[in-house]
Amino acid sequence: MFLFLFVAVFTASPLWAAEPTAKIHGILINADSMFRDTEKETAELEGNVQIVYQGQHIRSDKARVLLRSRQVELFGNVEIMDAKNTIVGDQVYLDYENNTGVIYNGYVQSGSITFSGTVLQKTGDAEYVVSSADYTACTNCPSTWSFSGTTVRAELGGYAYIKNAILRFGPVPVFWFPYLVVPLKSDRQSGLLTPTFEASDTGGFAMSLPYFWAISRSSDATIELKDYANRGLKGLLEYRYMLNENSEGSLNFGSLFDKAFADDERLNLYRPVTEKNDPIERYFVRYGHYLEMPDGGVHRAQINFASDLQYPKDFPTETLNHGDSAMENRVSYTKNTEDQHMSVDSSYYVNMLHGDPLAGNNDAVHRIPELRWSHSQQNIGESNFIYAFDLDVVNFTRGGNAYDDMTTQTSGDTTVRFPKNSCNDPKWEDNPLCKRVYDGSFDPSVDLIRTGQRIDFEPSVYYPIKLADGLDLVPAMSYRETHYNFNIEDNSHVVRRYLRAEMGARLSLSRVYGDTVSSKATRYKHEIIPEVTYSNLPWFTQDDSPFFGQGSVTDAPYSARDSITDLDIASDYSVQFDYNDRVYDRNLVTMALTNKVTEKRWVSDRPEYRQIGYLKLAQSYDASQQNRGGSIYEPWSDLTATLDVRLDRFQTYSIFNYFPYQNVTNASSRVRLMNDVGQFFQVQLTRQYKITPGQAVDTSARQEDYTFSTGFVSKYLNLMGKFVYDANWADRSSGDQIKSWAYIAQFKPTGDCLFITFIHDQVTGGDTNFKLNFAFTFDGVPKAPLPPETLDSYGF
């Protein structure tokens, strides 16, 4: 009897209960109880079932393995995991050889991407067809957002195609799409992006729908249609490319037939009656290019152009130059070697200061072309003599006349020089009835030369002398020769030559603070550097020319730190092409005192140096003023203080210029507090007075702006804002006390799958704008928050 039972059991259904783990046909199996039918080549598993095969780990309450067909039937709390994905369901039929199957009442999860449905067909390693499906990339439950559809065909690492898609926020249905394609990978891929909603005073409500085109591995584009309720339909393009690891470029273009601009008061003020209130086509082009070439040269291009002068104010985030006096368009090729610099450069400018937004550009002066060749300081043979030279050739050109017909008006002690016009008014451009007048004859006493060619050559020789440790003396001599060619009769060629002698003395005192015993301790080096420089022109010759004004050549009051301002136009020394046309520091002593603090700290096993503190005080004394005539005697220059502090949580960069004879201080100062989280607070001051030697300062005409910026970062909310306060608002006849402002709020609901960005801003003199954008994380990779620099793009 015992023998009969033994034979019967072991020929029908062998029992492995005594051995709960086994390996069959490359499959590792473990369960509370396991039965195998060798004839049918099946195995019945029950209780804490675990199956491992080719990187897949399968768990269930019960399973039936079909060894002949390489399939497994799983029941109850089924979970299939591999290195990338997890499959969970009530019941699963799996072809473990081909990695296909059917999942009932389950879901598939890859990272934070989850698909769930009543029936999920696994058609490949990462391909699924889901019925009565839900899709989300949120990590929370219930999910912040999801798409439900009758059918979803998904390829993990590719796309999901959803039929009858319904967007839900939480359980609430929001929008229905008949068909939707969403990306399931973080790689660049073509597809529609989420729409953006905007509203502005002039444009009205607007909705834009962008399409991202992944052209190749090194180029892509965003094509966008934006429909304004008041302006009309606008097309936008942004094309980006990379040419090599260090070379890239981008092209931005936009165009619309603007109906709202047709009613603009400024535009219609200058238009003929027959054209008033007619819509016009508006556009912009912005292009940036940087290319490192095989010969070691660098090709750069910067193009910024718009159809009208008001475009940057109406669309400040497109041209990115609202408030600038000119649009600069520049193309250059530069090549630097160990001791030389060579460049070919061309700059085309668009004058943005006209009253008429459709004004021409004939009065703008361009630099086309400009050639530079410089040789850096290098020893002469084996001696201590060092030489250097600079050569600059530039052609100044424009579409209009070679000179400006000018006239003057005097009121009290103030003389104003301005273009001759039919109204004889310095503010003639504000009146559309006023026109410029050209009499066809150059008047050297008042007219202004605007075009010509300049060749500038300057060799220099130095002889550094080390008197002691930390004490250096550097005598220098340079010769400068400049040739001008003007398109003006009787004033066609001008030459200027001079010698400059300089003597610089510098003392460096330093001390190291901190732990000097440990080799990897943090240390600080404090340097105090007093220095004195004397500059003199022992020989100077210059041809008489109205280009340099009517004042005495030897009395020109320029120093190297004086900038060109509008006040120069009416001065006795006129205004030239640029700063290089000035002769400065004729007999000048400059004294400076510099303090520097440098930190040395160790990052891992590598030393890191950074300058954490810098303070420089400088002032000059012009000895040549003693020999000048006139009633103005102001030999001391402004006292300049430059402060630069860069700590982990505190930064400031400030420049102060105190003018002793006017008793006022120009300031440009920024103070910033921040932490490691990304939160910050910043205050910036810009204060500028118009300084005229010998005259009192009109404080009511000053520019004094305070800019306040702050940023707050938290788990669910990011906030940052900025506004500019005009401290001189009460003394102005027009303008707002708050000149411009912007704030950005980013809401981050739970689940790391959605950014809701709200932007509210107003540029100086422009519209109030609202912008709302939803940034969904379809691929499961959370989006980074906007950096604080984003505020700078809103046309302050």
PLM regions with names:
Residues 1-12:
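Bacterial N-terminal signal peptides
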Residues 10-12, 16, 151, 718:
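A generic structural signal for solvent-exposed, polar alpha-helical segments
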Residues 17-132, 146-149, 153-154, 159-164, ...:
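N-terminal amphipathic/hydrophobic interface segments
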